[in-house]
A protein has these predicted regions:
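Multi-pass membrane glycosyltransferase architecture that uses lipid-linked
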Residues: 1-155, 197-360
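Extracytoplasmic catalytic-loop and juxtamembrane helix elements of membrane-embedded
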Residues: 147-178, 287-291
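Generic multipass alpha-helical transmembrane bundles of integral membrane proteins
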Residues: 165, 169-195, 204-205, 221, ...
């Protein structure tokens, strides 16, 4: 990656021996992670508005402590947070550019275009959405097209691998295969996995779209974005341990309830250790009685999935019952309030063009 190459260049420029290079490379990336973590925390505090303490969830999240250094995902998380902050200030094009840069790091920031489309449909104001979408595409292309031109084969490795890979760690599909191996059931057919995973995600997105458009009062951007990203991580071919980092800032803005946060983070921490114990079983030469049973690993996956589904259910409940939405309550109490709405602040508009905040 570009970031990895930059970290390698910095490592080589420092006065350390080749033997020390691996540790120095990790420390350089750790420095980036700490800065990015702080950026995301500060922006989340800013976006939380009157409920600024909700943003502290990002600062204390065990999920970031445990998984923040596994990959370069925090770059995408930070760019998405920057984009959402720009959007909340009415800078639609700038937000789109930041979303696109985030998507160049990790594709998941693209998912926010779905929630923005829902808000565009509800408000019947298309220009902000088109500006954001255009900025996203342009920024993503500005990063990727030169790399594609230089070496399209290397550039396409990620997409080829993603399309051809089988069930990955901690996905529902992998949990099924691990269970099937013990019970003698049929495995998930690899030739159909892509269709199953992305088809399930598409169905979830359709459900979120219908809910977002038809719900009586305008849902908040953070609520919709959390639902879409959660649907992706639950249905994807793999649930890498660092994917929890994607959800933490979104939850702080979508469902700022500390009890739910700590229960979820506890479950995710248990799942984190279960993943590494499962991997250790495959590479370490230890007796079976000293290894974690596969059923415990599957139970950890199911617990993680149920915890995320519980959070999704809570978000949907507050979308349907805005009087229980703490963010709306503390930002004036109007059922259509959203401090992150940006260009879509205010009630939705009906077919006549008049405000229709209670339109079904």
């Amino acid at each position: 990656s570009v970031v990895g190459s930059a970290a390698a260049w910095i490592t080589q420029a420092l006065p350390f021996s080749p033997e020390q290079g691996t540790v120095v490379f990790w420390l350089v990336n750790l420095g980036f992670v700490v800065v990015l973590w702080a950026v995301v925390a500060v922006l989340t505090v800013r976006m939380a508005g009157r409920r600024w303490t909700d943003g502290l969830m990002v600062a204390v999240a065990p999920g970031i402590v445990l998984a923040g250094t596994i990959n370069w995902d925090l770059w995408a998380v930070a760019l998405l947070a920057c984009g959402m902050y720009a959007w909340s200030r009415g800078r639609s094009l700038t937000a789109g550019v930041l979303f696109g840069l985030g998507a160049a790091m990790k594709l998941y920031p693209l998912l926010i275009l779905g929630p923005l489309l829902i808000l565009a449909v509800r408000s019947r104001r298309w220009r902000p959405f088109l500006l954001a979408a255009g900025g996203t595409v342009a920024a993503w292309a500005a990063v990727n097209v030169p790399l594609m031109v230089v070496n399209v084969q290397a550039w396409s490795v990620f997409f080829t691998f993603s399309g051809e890979r089988g069930p990955g760690l901690s996905s529902v599909w992998h949990a099924w295969d691990v269970t099937a191996a013990q019970a003698g059931w049929a495995f998930v057919p690899e030739g159909s996995l892509t269709l199953l995973a992305y088809g399930t995600f598409a169905v979830c997105c359709l459900g979120i779209f219908v809910l977002g458009v038809r719900v009586r009062h305008t849902p908040r951007l953070a609520q919709l974005t959390f639902l879409v990203v959660a649907a992706f991580v639950l249905t994807n071919k793999v649930y890498s341990p660092q994917f929890v980092v994607w959800l933490i800032p979104l939850l702080a803005l979508a469902l700022p309830r500390w009890r739910d946060f700590w229960v979820w983070q506890t479950v995710e921490a248990l799942h984190f250790f279960a993943v590494w114990m499962y991997l250790a079983k495959g590479v370490a030469e230890t007796p079976p009685q000293h290894s974690m049973d596969d059923s415990v690993y599957v139970a950890a996956i199911l617990a993680h999935m149920l915890a995320v589904l519980w959070l999704c259910g809570r978000v949907v409940w507050e979308m349907l019952h805005p009087a229980e939405d703490l963010v709306k309550r503390d930002h004036g109490g109007h059922p259509d309030t959203d401090p992150l709405a940006g260009a879509y602040a205010g009630p939705a508009r009906g077919r006549s063009g008049q405000p229709a905040a209670v339109q079904a």
